[in-house]
Swiss-Prot record:
Gene this chain is encoded by: tarB
The reaction(s) this protein catalyses: N-acetyl-beta-D-mannosaminyl-(1->4)-N-acetyl-alpha-D-glucosaminyl di-trans,octa-cis-undecaprenyl diphosphate + CDP-glycerol = 4-O-[(2R)-glycerylphospho]-N-acetyl-beta-D-mannosaminyl-(1->4)-N-acetyl-alpha-D-glucosaminyl di-trans,octa-cis-undecaprenyl diphosphate + CMP + H(+)
Species assigned in the record: Bacillus spizizenii (strain ATCC 23059 / NRRL B-14472 / W23)
Main EC class the enzyme belongs to: transferase
Keywords assigned: Cell membrane, Cell wall biogenesis/degradation, Membrane, Teichoic acid biosynthesis, Transferase
GO molecular function, one term: CDP-glycerol glycerophosphotransferase activity
Protein known as: Teichoic acid glycerol-phosphate primase
Protein family (similarity comment): Belongs to the CDP-glycerol glycerophosphotransferase family.
Lineage, broadest ranks: Bacteria, Bacillati, Bacillota, Bacilli, Bacillales
Top-level lineage group: Bacteria
Role this protein plays: Catalyzes the addition of a single glycerol phosphate residue to the prenoldiphosphate-linked disaccharide.
Cell membrane listed as a keyword: yes
Amino acid sequence: MKSWFAFFYYLFIKVIGALLFWVKLGNQVTLLVSFPDNARAILKEYQKGHFSFPIHVLLTQHAKSLEKEFPELTVSVINEKHPLHICKAVFSMLNSKTVIVDNYFVLTTVLTSRPDIECIQVWHANGAFKRFGLKDINTQNRSRADIRRFRKVYASFDRIVVGSEHMADIFKEFFDIKGDTFLRFGVPLTDAYYEARENSNDLKSKYQLPAEKKIILYAPTFRDHQFESFSLPFSEKQLQHDLKGEYLLAVKLHPVMKESAELPEDSAWIKDVSDLPLADLLKMSDLLISDYSSVPFEFALLDKPILFYTYDMEAYNRTRGLIRHYTEVIPGMPCCDSGMLLDQLKDMDKLQSEVERFSREWNLYSRGNASKQLLSYVNEKSN
């Protein structure tokens, strides 16, 4: 049923694209957004006023908070399944010289018949531990029609922005990219980590976290239907005794996981921070514990230690899929229990040097001016 809906959805978009063949190419840029971070960085740079083209921002429901952040820009919130919204989005794209997207959108397939419109993919993460695209484990179970549709979407990307050669190689494999289509500008969302940083104690005060404690941020990846396996890296007892009461464990969960996870209430040692902005949490944290999430790629820009709590690595690799050589790529070693995590914490200098190596490799081109480089490139193409 799902495949049939996807087929008719794709067909509807193609029909709309054909019916709007008369739309003339304009000088505007359309920004199609599903995650706010890259778009926020791009729009902040755009507002500095150095660019000659108008911009139209199309926000999906997940990114609609940006509408309030940029009230002076032309911003529309769209429902990708609403026929009128689809027509509006396709019209805007066909009226653009450049279309910038941050995710997989079937909408971009209308651009394959319009070589005069350049589609630029600015992926919503600056690194990847999980397989996606054509190499996603679940893709093996999809029909040939589904896979052909996936390929048509990936083929619509004329350019892909990358922050490292590692990500360029991943896109080549996961999207089956032929040739060098990459813009080595760095990933826009990383620009924020080069701006003046708010004092960590000020941030702790803002969010009512104890100033005297160091913060361990635990930010695990989303787990599909595996809530029963959710595990905290440390217990309250370990935080009090093994870590000498110096740390607060701040837990940032995906909304779906938050509904099912049982976290201690009114604890002095463990606090649910799932509703707080990730960027602020990263800036105020002294240590990150994650697993297969892309969060470590951002946190590495802050030159702070990272631990990997991978208690379900084999099961996760079977059901979701990890990149090759995951255990060699991560800075440090995978830890399957809290005892291993505590052992790793004894050598902070080694953890720090591993993070520096990791960031050099994965944030090679992200140097604080990614948004400016991207918009300057688009500006030159528009003139």
